[in-house]
Amino acid sequence: MNDLIKHKLELLPNNPGCYLHKDKFGNIIYVGKAKNLKNRVRSYFRGSHDTKTELLVSEIADFEFIVTESNIEALLLEINLIQENMPKFNIRLKDGKSYPFIKITKELYPRLLITRQVKKDGGLYFGPYPDAGAANEIKKLLDRIFPFKKCKNPANKVCFYYHIGQCKAHTICHTTEAYWQGLVEDVKNFLNGHDDKIVNQLKAKMKDMSDQMEFERAAEYRDLIEAVSTLRTKQRVIRQDMQDRDIFGYYVDKGWMCVQVFFVRQGKLIQRDVNMFPYYNDAEEDFLTYIGQFYLDSRHLKPKEIFIPGDIDQESVEALVGNEVKVFKPQRGEKKQLVNLAMKNARVSLTQKFDLLEKDIAKTQGAIENLGKLMGIPTPVRIESFDNSNIMGTSPVSAMVVFENGKPNKKEYRKYKIKTVEGPDDYASMREVIRRRYSRVKRDGLTPPDLIIMDGGQGQVNVAKDVLRNELNLSIPVAGLQKNDKHQTNELLFGDPLRVIDLPRQSEEFFLLHRIQDEVHRFAITFHRQVRSKNSFSSKLDGVEGLGPKRKQKLLKNFKSMTAIQQASVEDIQALGIPEKVAQALLDKLSQDSH
C-alpha cells in the first residue's frame, strides 16, 4: 500500500457511495458500492482475501469515490459506472441484460412482469434495476396503483387480485383496448418520473375516503403517496426522462474553489469532472467564468440542460452557454437534490485535498533531496515553475509559482501579461516571460532558483534553456513536466540531451512534482480568467462618452458584474462620483445591448 492510499483511507467519509479503484496508469480497474465508504474501502487493505481480490489489490495505485444520499443510489450509480468504464475486475454485464427489468407485455390485456432478458417482442422495458429486490419493490408499488391483469385465468373466471382491487377482470369489468393503452401510458409516465398526475389522483381518492369516514382506506392511499415519494428519491441517480444534462456544484474554502460537474447522459449519471483552483474575486464571478471556459474546452460537449446552484445568476449562465442549452436553477424536489449532491461532493473533494496536502508537506523534504540525487543536481531548495494560459491566443498570460523546501511561497508568485506576442504562440510567449523574469533576477541581484520546471515538454524546455544560456548567460537547471493524453502529470524530462527521469508514480518525488504542476496550472488559469473577465467587462463599457479607464475600474470594483450594473439605478452609479448624464448614457447602452 503506497503513502497516497494510506492518507486517503484516513479521510474517507462514513457515507454511502461508489468507489473507483485505479491502476498506476490512472485506469479504472474496479467499481464498487458501499453503505459505508470508509469501512468498505479500508477492508481491501486489511486482512487476507481470496486470490481474485488479492490480484485486484496488488494493482490498486489510487482510488476516488462519489458520495450518494442512500445505498439504493449507490447501487444505481454502480451500474452506470460499470457500464460506462467496463473495469477489467468487474463482471462485464454487456448492455445490462443480466440485471432485472420491469416489463409491460404487448398483449390485448397487458401484464406487468420482472425479467432479466430484453427481447424485441414489442414489450416495454424499464430499467435496469440494481437487483431483484429493487425491481420487486417497484413492481409491488405499481401493482397497488395500476390494476393490470395478473393471472392467466379464462375470461369468465376472476382471480384473487380482482377481489383486492389490483386486477381488472377484463370480461367482467367490460374494459376496452383504449382503457388498457391508457393504463400503459400512465405507467410509462410514472416510471419516466412524471408522477404528479398519479399523486394527485391518489390524494383525491384519499380525501374522498376520508370524507366518507373510510379512514382505513384513506390510510392505504396515504401510504401509497408516501411510497411514490420514496421511490422518487431512490431513483435519483437514474433519471427516467432520458435527458442529457450537466449538474454543477461548487464549494469554497481557504481561498480555493472546487467545482464538481456530474454528467448525466440518457438519464444516467455516468461520469464527473472535479476541478480545484485558487480564486481571487467574488465566488459567483469565478464560478461563472469557470462555466464559460468549461464549454470552450472541446472535450466538453454542451448538453440539452444545465442545473446550477441557487445562488448563481441564471441569466449570466444563459449568456455564457448560448440559446441551445436550457439553464435551470432547481428550487425543490429531485432536481434540487441532484444539485445538492454535486455541492456535497465538491465540499468532500476540497476538504480531502487540504487534508492530503497537510500530510504530504511533512514528507516533502526527503522528496526534494531524492529528486536532486535522481537528477544529478544539488538539492533544489527553491523551485520556480512556469505555465501559459490563453484561449485561441486571446488575453495570453503566463504565471510563475515558487516552492521553497517543498512548500508554496505565495508571496513570491508572479503574473505576466504577454506583451510582444500576437496570436496563440506558446513558445514565443514563454520566451518573453523567461527573458523578463531572469533579466530582472540578473539585473537586481536576486537569488536564482535551484531548478526551473516548465509545464510542458521538450519545446518549452529548449526555449527556456536558449534564453538563459544564449541571451542571459545564466546556468540554471531546467526540467519539463510532460502530461499524458488525459492531461495528467506523466513524465519528468531533464538532461542534455533531454531524457525521462525514472520516477515511480506513487513516489513522494512524483507527488511533489504533481503538486507543483497542479499549482502553476491553477494559478495561470485563474489569472487568465481575471484578465479575460476584466477585458470583457471593459469592452462592454466602451463607447460611453465620459467613461474612461478610472471610472470603468470603479464600476468593476463596486459592482463586480455586468448584471449588477444593469440592475443599478442612476443614483447608485452617481454615488461613485460618475455624473448623472454619463450614468444614464451607460444604462441606456447596456439596455440596448441586452436586446
UniProtKB/Swiss-Prot annotation:
Domain GIY-YIG: 14-91
Source organism, top-level taxon: Bacteria
Keywords (A to Z) from UniProt: Cytoplasm, DNA damage, DNA excision, DNA repair, Excision nuclease, SOS response
PROSITE patterns assigned to the protein according to its UniProt record, in alphabetical order: GIY_YIG, UVR, UVRC
Subcellular localization, as worded in the UniProt entry: Cytoplasm
GO molecular function annotation: DNA binding; excinuclease ABC activity
GO CC annotations on file: cytoplasm; excinuclease repair complex
Annotated Pfam families: GIY-YIG, HHH_5, UVR, UvrC_RNaseH, UvrC_RNaseH_dom
UVR domain ranges (all copies): 196-231
GO terms under biological process: nucleotide-excision repair; SOS response
NCBIfam families (UniProt xref): uvrC
Assembly notes: Interacts with UvrB in an incision complex.
Function: The UvrABC repair system catalyzes the recognition and processing of DNA lesions. UvrC both incises the 5' and 3' sides of the lesion. The N-terminal half is responsible for the 3' incision and the C-terminal half is responsible for the 5' incision.
Family of this protein: Belongs to the UvrC family.
Protein name: UvrABC system protein C
